């Protein structure tokens, strides 16, 4: 059924249909009785899916990835739609319009998206107001990054300002230094630059802090960031952001679309490689959140058994539809029961343990 609906939705430009569908979701879930009904139908209800991660209780491991709800306008929607949590943002200290449109494109033959949104958002102050005025039913993380207009010399202060505004209202914070759509941002993944940013954010908030990394960095850079995260006692790492690689894409005319980060199945292989490397280096000393190319319950299960405590999706939601979170959670629950696992936590990294 959703295939037919998706075909119709895809007749409209991506950013336009995103705005329309998001408005509809907010409207429906603004009604308490409908919100409760949706959560009863779609929500992760099996207790085996619940886990406590960095002191936060998650009813299910699959969350909405950053980028869909940039300004926290749908805080009440995500639990009702079956997600175990949501990460809102990316938000910057100051409002900014992002890059010129068109800036989002579908790659249907790859079941992928290409975006160069450029962190369009209303600013951390506006998001703080949203967070203060709503009580979501699931944990809400906030993804923060640098305002494009902020000089490099004030980068740390920019991140600190965002952390100061939204930190007290978030379940956790993610420091984003890995988007390909802000000039120079990925350079901040260099350890000495990243150290200063993370120390600044940690000084501003008491909530768990994670860092989000790119799939396109080298293995040695991954190791350096991982060691820094352990040294600074971060809560964890989100892996990975979108990729700039165009390898193996089959959608015609991709070069004509211009620059941007690609999400969905084309990033899946590298996302798994990064996850396995991270878990092999730190085990359970850091919480690992895996994102990138998760489409099916099998994909989700592979990430969990490879070491991910939590998962995120965005492109899978676009291509999979409103029942996608439920299908993923139901599939994970079934595999937990079939495998004799008493809890989700028991399954995390289990494939790695068996291979040793």
Swiss-Prot record:
Pathway listed: Pyrimidine metabolism; UMP biosynthesis via de novo pathway; orotate from (S)-dihydroorotate (quinone route): step 1/1
Lineage: Bacteria, Bacillati, Actinomycetota, Actinomycetes, Mycobacteriales
Cofactor note: Binds 1 FMN per subunit.
One GO cellular component, as annotated: plasma membrane
Gene Ontology MF: a single term: dihydroorotate dehydrogenase (quinone) activity
Chief localisation class: membrane
Active site: 179 (nucleophile)
Residues noted as binding substrate in the record, renumbered to the chain: 70, 115-119, 176, 181, 241-242
Signal peptide from the UniProt entry: none
Keyword Amino-acid biosynthesis assigned: no
Organism for this UniProt entry: Mycobacterium leprae (strain TN)
Residues reported in the UniProt entry to bind FMN: 66-70, 90, 143, 176, 212, 240, 264, 293, 314-315
Reactions mediated catalytically: (S)-dihydroorotate + a quinone = orotate + a quinol
A biological process from GO: 'de novo' UMP biosynthetic process
Gene that encodes the chain: pyrD
Topology within the bilayer: Peripheral membrane protein
Protein known as: Dihydroorotate dehydrogenase (quinone)
InterPro entries associated with the record: Aldolase_TIM (IPR013785), DHO_dehydrogenase (IPR050074), Dihydroorotate_DH_2 (IPR005719), Dihydroorotate_DH_cat (IPR005720), Dihydroorotate_DH_CS (IPR001295)
Pfam families referenced in this protein's UniProt entry, alphabetically: DHO_dh
Assigned protein family: Belongs to the dihydroorotate dehydrogenase family. Type 2 subfamily.
Assembly information from the UniProt record: Monomer.
Compartments where located: Cell membrane
């Amino acid at each position: 059924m959703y295939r037919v609906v998706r075909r119709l939705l895809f007749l409209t430009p991506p950013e336009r249909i995103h705005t329309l569908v998001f408005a509809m979701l907010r409207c429906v879930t603004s009604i308490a009785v409908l919100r409760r009904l949706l959560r009863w139908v779609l929500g992760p209800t099996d207790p085996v899916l619940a886990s406590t991660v960095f002191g936060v209780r998650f009813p299910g491991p699959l969350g909405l990835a950053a980028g869909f709800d940039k300004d926290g306008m749908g805080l009440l929607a995500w639990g009702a739609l079956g997600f175990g949590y949501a990460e809102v943002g990316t938000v910057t200290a100051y409002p900014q319009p992002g890059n010129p449109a068109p800036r989002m494109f579908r790659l249907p033959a790859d079941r992928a998206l290409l975006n160069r949104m450029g962190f369009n958002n209303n600013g951390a102050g506006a998001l703080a107001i949203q967070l203060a005025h709503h009580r979501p039913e699931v944990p809400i993380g906030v993804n923060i990054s640098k305002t494009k207009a902020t000089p490099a010399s004030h980068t740390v202060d920019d991140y600190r300002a965002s952390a100061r505004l939204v930190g007290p209202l978030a379940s956790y914070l993610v420091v984003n230094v890995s988007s390909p759509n802000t000039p120079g941002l990925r350079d901040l993944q260099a350890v000495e630059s990243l150290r200063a940013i993370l120390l600044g954010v940690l000084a501003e908030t008491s909530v768990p802090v994670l860092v989000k990394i790119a799939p396109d960095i080298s293995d040695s850079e991954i190791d350096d960031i991982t060691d820094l995260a352990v040294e600074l006692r971060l809560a964890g790492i989100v892996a990975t952001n979108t990729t700039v690689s165009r390898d193996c894409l089959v959608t015609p005319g991709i070069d004509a679309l211009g620059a941007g980060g690609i999400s969905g199945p084309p990033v899946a292989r590298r996302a798994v490689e990064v996850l396995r490397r991270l878990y092999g280096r730190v085990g359970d000393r850091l919480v690992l959140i895996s994102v990138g190319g998760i489409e099916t319950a099998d994909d989700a299960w592979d990430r969990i058994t490879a070491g991910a405590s939590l998962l995120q999706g965005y492109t899978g939601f676009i291509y999979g539809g409103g029942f996608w979170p439920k299908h993923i959670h139901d599939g994970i629950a079934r595999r937990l029961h079939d495998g004799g696992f008493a809890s989700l936590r028991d399954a995390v990294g289990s494939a790695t343990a068996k291979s040793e």
